[in-house]
């Protein structure tokens, strides 16, 4: 069995270089929540050096709060901003002689698009209009995945190793209890359940069906590198191949 392992990079974390030796896909910040032209170039080069698939990580324009502020922007504005960010990274990737593989929204843009079909439609249309061969990454079972399918994009359903889930399969909001999993054993067990059994236990104790095609490791987590190594070892022991 195969699984993609992705990480958000270019967000100012010192561990990016090491993390890129452990994952198969990199979501590179495009300047709206973190990063700039230089960090984008550096991240692209580092990803290419490690044979890691490159993706754009567009966000709401919110550098002050790392893209985690809820915004009520018109879909047309989100469409334009998504195109802008994808295009910026795409130019850098092309200049390095490679191609971009996927797009994964960041933070609150990701969370809102998981539930708001109009926002999801704007993002999916931007990805399709820029390059219909790009993979759209979104929360498993979300509106963003459905919007991507409507635009006939290849979609990749994402699960999170270190996030708590609600009974409907959505993520527990960051400000609520149970949003983040700090215990490494719990995060590892949850990830293996999602990948191997297609299920996740919600914070209320209810088991929910989930499709896991890519697993996110947050590079800004305190133990991200150690956990990534443990997860790779666990996958290897179970004959689960990490591949983009």
UniProtKB/Swiss-Prot annotation:
Keyword Hydrolase among record annotations: yes
Coiled coil ranges: none
Top EC class, one word: hydrolase
Molecular-function annotations in GO: 5-oxoprolinase (ATP-hydrolyzing) activity; ATP binding
GO BP, sorted A to Z: carbohydrate metabolic process
InterPro entries from the UniProt entry: Glyco_hydro/deAcase_b/a-brl, LamB/YcsF/PxpA-like
Any matching Pfam family: LamB_YcsF
Catalytic activity: 5-oxo-L-proline + ATP + 2 H2O = L-glutamate + ADP + phosphate + H(+)
Keywords from the UniProt entry: ATP-binding, Hydrolase, Nucleotide-binding
EC code: 3.5.2.9
Keyword Metal-binding tagged: no
Family under the similarity heading: Belongs to the LamB/PxpA family.
Subunit structure as annotated in this protein's UniProt entry: Forms a complex composed of PxpA, PxpB and PxpC.
PANTHER family: 5-OXOPROLINASE SUBUNIT A (PTHR30292:SF0), UNCHARACTERIZED PROTEIN YBGL-RELATED (PTHR30292)
NCBIfam families: PRK05406.1-1, PRK05406.1-3, PRK05406.1-4, PRK05406.1-5
Function: Catalyzes the cleavage of 5-oxoproline to form L-glutamate coupled to the hydrolysis of ATP to ADP and inorganic phosphate.
Protein name: 5-oxoprolinase subunit A
């Amino acid at each position: 069995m195969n699984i993609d392992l992705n990480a958000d990079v270019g967000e100012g974390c010192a561990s990016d270089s090491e993390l890129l030796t452990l994952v198969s896909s990199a979501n590179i910040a495009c300047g709206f929540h973190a990063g700039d032209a230089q960090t984008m170039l550096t991240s692209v080069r580092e990803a290419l050096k490690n044979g890691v698939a490159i993706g754009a990580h567009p966000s709401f324009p919110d550098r002050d709060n790392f893209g985690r502020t809820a915004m009520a922007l018109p879909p047309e504005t989100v469409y334009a901003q998504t195109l802008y960010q994808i295009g910026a990274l795409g130019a850098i990737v092309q200049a390095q002689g490679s191609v971009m593989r996927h797009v994964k929204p960041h933070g609150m843009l990701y969370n809102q698009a998981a539930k708001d079909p109009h926002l999801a439609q704007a993002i999916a249309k931007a990805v399709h209009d820029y390059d219909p061969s790009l993979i759209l990454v979104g929360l498993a079972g979300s509106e963003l995945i459905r919007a991507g399918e409507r635009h006939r994009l290849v979609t990749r359903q994402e699960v999170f190793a270190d996030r708590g889930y609600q009974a409907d399969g959505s993520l527990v909001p960051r400000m609520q209890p149970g949003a983040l999993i700090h215990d490494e054993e719990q995060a590892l067990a949850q990830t293996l359940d999602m990948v191997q059994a297609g299920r996740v236990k919600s914070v209320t104790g209810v088991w929910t069906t989930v499709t896991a095609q890519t697993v996110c490791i947050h590079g800004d987590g305190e133990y991200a590198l150690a956990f990534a190594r443990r997860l790779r070892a666990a996958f290897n022991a179970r004959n689960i191949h990490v591949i983009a």
